[in-house]
Amino acid sequence: MDVHFDNWRFLSRPDKVIVHLLLPQTFFESHHIPFDPNLTFWSQTRFHHLDFPPTRYVKIWGKLYFSLPGLPSKACPGIAVSLVINIEENMYNPFDMTVLKILLNENIYYIKFFHMELFFPYIAPNSLQDTSIEEPFKNVDHIDAILNTTSPVTNLYKNPLGVLANLLQSRPQSSPRHHFALEDPGKVRGYEQPSLLQTDKAMPKVSYVKHKWSILNSEPTVTCVKHIFTKKSYFICSYPTMSNSQCTSVLDTISVQELAHVSPTAVLDAEKAFLFKHQHRFVNTLEHVCKSKNYAIEQHVPVLIQKDEETASSIKDHFTETCFVLESTVSEASAWVRATFARYLNKPKAFWIDYIRLWEEGVHTLGKSVPELKEDVCEEKMWHLLSLNKEFIHCIRNQGCTGVLVDSNLNAWLILPGGFVIKGHYNITPEDILFVGARYG
C-alpha cells in the first residue's frame, strides 16, 4: 500500500526496521479505540534493558482500507500503518516493546507490541515459502552487479595472451583523462606522445544506470499474527522491494544459563510498578484524610439524596470499592498521568477526570479533559461548573460510578455518588515527571 511505502521511504534508517501492519476494525474494538479515519499515529520503542531510555515518538502515516486482495473478510475494514523499531548492529531483542500511540482529538490510546511477534514473519518458515516474487532469489556478488550495470571505460583482457599482445603493440591512450597532468604508466615525460585532443578515437558514450522501481505495484506477503496481550489477529506485510535486513535475536548470543535469568516481561513490570506505586500512594492519602476527619465527608455538588443509614452505607461501600479499583487501575491514560505530562511540558493549569466503573460494570473512561475548568478557577466555582457538565452529573447521580478529578498541580479529588468529595494528592518527584514525559507524552 502507498501508506506503507511512504513510511518506509521517509522513516527508514540503517538503525531502524520498518514493520508494516494491517489492523482490522475488530482489533481496535478490542482495545476500546474508536475506529475513525481521523486517528493520528506515533511509534516508540521501549527497551527490555531498563537502563536504556525509550526512544522519542516518531509520527507515522496511517490509512483506512476497506478491502485488499487476499485478505479474509474479517480483516476488512481496517487501518494500514507502520511501526518504527530501533535496533543495534542488526540485532533485536524479542522482549523489547514498540508502542503505537493513537490520538483522536484530546484522547490518547496505546497499543503495545512485543518484538517477538513483530519479527515473527521474518523468521517463520511458512512465511518464506509463500512469496509473491516471480523470480527465485539469486546470490549476486555486489561487485559483479556494479560491473554488469556500468559501461567499461578501459580495455580489459580476459586471458594472459591478450595481456602479452598488448605489451608488444602500441595503442592509443586507453581511457579519457579529465586532467592533462595524468599520464599512462611507463611514459617518459618529454617524449612525443599522441595528444588526447588529436586522437580520432571517439569519446565513450555515457551509460546511465537504470533501476526498475515498482514499489507500488509489488504484492506483499501477508502473515497473520496473534497479538500477545489481547489474542486478537492482525496482519504484517512483507514487501519484496522494501525488505528489511536480516536481523538476529540477541538471545542467540547468550548461554542457556544466562537466559534462565532473563525476565521476558521486565519492561512491562517496571512500568506497572511505577503506575501502581503512585496509585497506591494516592489511595493512602485519601484514607489518611478520611481518618483525620473521623470519616466525615463534605458534599460539594448539590445533589438530592436520601438522608438515611442505607444511603450512608452505600456511599461507604462506593468509597471502599473505589480504593480497591484505583489500585488496580494502572493505565498510562489515567488523569494523573495526563496531568503529570502537562507539568512536564510546563503547560498552563488544566484538569482531567477519570470515570471509574465499580463492581466490574462497564469500562472506565480515563484521562478525559475538562476544558470548562480554566487556569484561574477556584474550588467553589469549579464545583459549580462541573454541576453543569452532563456526563459528570450522570456519574454522581447513579450508583456504580465514581470520579477522580486531577489538575496540573497534581491535586486530586475523589467524587462519590451524591456529590461527596475527598481531596488527596499525587506526590510526584522530578524523576517521576521525566519518566512520564519520556513514555506517556
From Swiss-Prot:
One of its GO terms (cellular component) is viral capsid. GO terms for biological process: chromosome organization. Pfam families: Herpes_UL17 (PF04559). Keywords: Capsid protein, Host nucleus, Late protein, Viral genome packaging, Viral release from host cell, Virion. The keyword DNA damage does not apply. InterPro entries: UL17-like. Interacts (via C-terminus) with capsid vertex component 2/CVC2. Capsid vertex-specific component that plays a role during viral DNA encapsidation, assuring correct genome cleavage and presumably stabilizing capsids that contain full-length viral genomes. This is Capsid vertex component 1.
